């Protein structure tokens, strides 16, 4: 199973992501792949993301799966 990106803290709506906000974890259902963490830095979330929430592609403005 591949790791997905999970919120390490509460991320308020419209916040630009930084490395400390995210961690890699194997979760079900899978979200954004952990290897995309470098691409997520600087992108904004379009909703509040609670700690422990798996980041899904539709939660991050400008993110497109490769």
Curated annotation (Swiss-Prot):
Could you tell me what this protein is called?
Ice-structuring protein LP
**Lineage of source species:** Eukaryota, Metazoa, Chordata, Craniata, Vertebrata
> Per UniProt, which keywords does this protein have?
Antifreeze protein, Secreted
SUPFAM superfamilies tied to this protein: AFP III-like domain
Give one Pfam family. SAF
Similarity annotation: Belongs to the type-III AFP family.
Q: What job does this protein perform?
A: Contributes to protect fish blood from freezing at subzero sea water temperatures. Lowers the blood freezing point. Binds to nascent ice crystals and prevents further growth.
**Gene Ontology CC, one term:** extracellular region
């Amino acid at each position: 199973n591949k790791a997905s990106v999970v919120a390490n803290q509460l991320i308020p709506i419209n916040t630009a992501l930084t490395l400390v906000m995210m961690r890699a974890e194997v979760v079900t259902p899978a979200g954004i792949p952990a290897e995309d963490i470098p691409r997520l830095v600087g992108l904004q979330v379009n909703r509040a993301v609670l700690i422990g929430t798996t980041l899904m592609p539709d939660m991050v403005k400008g993110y497109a799966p490769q």
